[in-house]
């Protein structure tokens, strides 16, 4: 399949590489020319704008930091809408505000362009090995059409509902992950300061109700003092802020999310 890919950052670059490995023809764009050069060296074609991507592809993936970047990539100067043919499908795999996702989708629809939101979870390691979790919102028939393409970057791809639902699921994911990481850190610190071996505590609790993917992924790193970042904290703050905005819009209480965002901002 010929696919456009806009956004070759920490997540987008390995995701695009996996699409190439699966045999797709890729046309890519990013403002970071070094990232573009790396993907081009792997077999993609590099172009100078989103509009140039859309001129060649009727299936386009976007993977950019936040809502304004998605809007710019889709509807801004030099963006997808400038040259996209009616019937073009944009699969936005960024993590953005679900309300804004719906607005962008409505504006694209006026131009005959369909939007799906398909944010991912798993971080850079799972982007590299192609085992991301993808949560998708949009038309079910479009999801069915692109399921196999998405699976080339993922370990699981789940249809959640109408446009915007994918980002609602991602916000729920980010709330749980942030609070879980904080809880693991606090618990292991408690064990160490109490004079108990954190490794033995980890082994004791991981098979019980406290066991989780986050515990198994993060506890060993914490105990090894491996704090190499796999995700920028400002992006997680962005996700929590989007979660709070979404919660406030529907009067859903989110006190733990608010507290967690304050802690992250302090860091």
Model feature map: region roles:
Residues 163, 167, 211-267:
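Interdomain hinge/lid region at the active-site interface
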Residues 52-54, 59-60, 67-132:
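Rossmann-like NAD(P)(H) cofactor-binding subdomain of soluble oxidoreductases
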Residues 8, 96-174, 178:
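Rossmann-fold dinucleotide-binding core
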Residues 26, 46, 114-116, 157, ...:
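Hydrophobic beta-strand scaffold residues
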Residues 129-137, 158, 162-194, 203-217, ...:
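Active-site-proximal catalytic alpha-helix in oxidoreductases
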Residues 1-63, 88, 93:
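NAD(P)+-binding Rossmann beta1-loop-alpha1 motif at the extreme N-terminus of oxidoreductases
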């Amino acid at each position: 399949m010929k696919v456009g890919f806009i956004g070759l950052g920490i997540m987008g670059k390995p995701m695009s590489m996996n699409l190439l490995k699966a045999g797709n023809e890729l046309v890519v764009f990013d403002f970071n020319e070094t990232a573009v050069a790396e993907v081009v060296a792997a077999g993609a074609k590099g172009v100078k704008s989103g509009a140039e991507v859309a001129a060649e592809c009727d299936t386009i993936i976007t993977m950019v930091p936040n809502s304004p970047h998605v809007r710019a990539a889709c509807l801004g100067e030099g963006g997808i809408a400038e040259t996209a043919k009616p019937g073009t499908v944009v699969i936005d795999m960024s993590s953005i505000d679900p309300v804004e996702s719906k607005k962008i989708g409505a504006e694209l629809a006026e131009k005959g362009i369909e939007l799906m939101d398909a944010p991912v979870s798993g971080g850079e390691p799972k982007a590299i090995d192609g085992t991301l979790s993808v949560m998708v919102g949009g038309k079910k028939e479009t999801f069915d059409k692109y399921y196999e393409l998405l699976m080339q970057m993922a370990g699981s791809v789940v249809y959640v509902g109408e446009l915007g639902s994918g980002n609602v699921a991602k916000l729920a994911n980010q709330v749980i992950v942030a609070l879980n990481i904080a809880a693991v850190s606090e618990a292991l610190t408690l064990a160490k300061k109490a004079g108990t071996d954190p490794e033995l505590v980890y082994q004791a609790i991981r098979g019980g109700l406290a066991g989780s993917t986050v515990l198994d992924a993060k506890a060993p790193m914490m105990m090894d003092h491996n704090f190499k970042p796999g995700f920028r904290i400002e992006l997680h703050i962005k996700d929590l802020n989007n979660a709070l905005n979404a919660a406030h819009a529907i009067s859903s209480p989110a006190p733990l999310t608010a507290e967690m965002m304050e802690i992250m901002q302090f860091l």
